[in-house]
Amino acid sequence: MQITDEQAKAMTSAGLNLIAQALTIYDSDLKLVVSNAPFQQMFNLPDRLVTPGAPFEDTIHHLATRGEYGPVEDVDSFVTERTDQARAFIPHYMERTRANGRTISVEGSPLPQGGWVSVYTDI
């Protein structure tokens, strides 16, 4: 059976949107490559932040200004710090309590070709 690239993309998107966990993939320049619908829903993100090419730092800035990371005195410094951490491309796992009181786990792993894949789970 042969499928077109467009069909493969549609099938992959359907599969990613079916899972309950939120997922993002950023390239080596920290630009969004792909995210699933649960990512946008979990964080109530505007479309501009889940469109391929959206900068990682814009998403962090948006979340920080909404209190997603707790009280942040200097949002710009916080965004710079988080972006620098992401650029280190070191695997990580953390659990944090969100502004809505729910706890999520965040697991990130660098990709061999550069970039990140992150999975967010409501625990």
Give the label of every model feature segment:
Residues N17:
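Primarily the dimerization/phosphotransfer
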Residues M1-A14:
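Short, charged amphipathic alpha-helical "coupling" segments at sensory-output junctions
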Residues T12, V106-E107:
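Catalytic micro-motifs at enzyme active sites that drive phosphoryl/nucleotidyl and oxygen chemistry
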Residues M1-Q2, A20-R87, P110-I123:
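PAS-family sensory domains
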Residues T83-S105, P112-G114:
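Per-ARNT-Sim (PAS) sensory domains and their PAS-associated C-terminal
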